Amino acid sequence: MLLYNDKRKLIMEEFTQMIQKEILKKIKEYDTIIIHHHVNPDPDCIGSQLGLKYLIQASFPDKKVYAVGTHTERTKFMGELDVVSDEVFPEALVIIVDVGDTKRIDDERFKLGKEMIKIDHHPLTETFCNLEWVDTSYAACCEMIIDFYVQNQDELILTNEAARVLYAGLLTDTGRFYYNSVTERTLRYGAIVYEYDFDKLELYSHLYFRSVDDLKFVGYIMNNFEYTENGLGYMRINQELLDKFNVSPDYASGLVNTLGNLKEIIMWMFFTEDKGLGKIRTSFRSRGPIVNKLAAKYGGGGHMWASGTLADNWETVDKIIKDADELCKEFKKGL
């Protein structure tokens, strides 16, 4: 006898197989494929983009496959992105990975593509593609690309190069398999790509090794972050601090989980000034209160316990902190 959850799981698996077959069919139909990522990409974003590119290239050598957009300092080591002229787009299949809404897609030329496919593990906020595979049960978009390979490996070829970037994305978006989004499937797929021949130590060095300046900056954070009696922790990082410790906004904002292991804190946030963007990067993390609705209120989005947005100024940051503290207060009342 099938229980409700078993039936639901079976239905989702059948849907996933169906939509994967449709995606594979579209890939076969097009000679040119252009893959886009989101603004300020993280390793999961670049990993799923380049991983899919390498997967398609190895499986269909005659196709022209491009990965477009810009890197952050954190992702440059993962592989080169492509420069594509405007005239290539009108006859191309565009695939958008790890992003749920149009305003966060890097390179607006995605609109010029003949057809569009979306592959994303964030909650659905906007429908804009001809074909959309959106599933929040995956801990990372890289896990979705690995699943795409696993379920269709009779027609697809996974290379060492693809395995390397997919593992990097899976590793970082799960907090080294620590977050509660991790499932048995996540671990199994991590093991599959880990078996491929790439330099694990070199990969870890790019992701986790720190300079003396970096370590001093982390020490400053631990000595100067703020927190409330409701369990909210937060850190404001302005340009003066970035200059003092010789760190980039990319690196600084990536340290948000520095506050994640403090037992007094149930929600933590980083606010990092980015002169290049003219905005303040805002990262939300939680092990209790749901944060993606708060992020959406300020024009952002993401997962239930990991989200972000861009604030226009420090006055907006103050409002976010006030709302977040109230969220923590209400959450504690319900315990």
For every predicted segment, state its role:
Residues 13-76, 86, 90-92, 175-335:
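Hydrophobic helix-and-loop "lid/oligomerization" segment in the mid-to-C-terminal part
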Residues 51-53, 111-114, 134-135, 188:
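Glycine-rich, phosphate-binding/catalytic loops in enzymes
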Residues 82-86, 134-137, 286-287:
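Short, hinge-like loop/turn segments at secondary-structure boundaries
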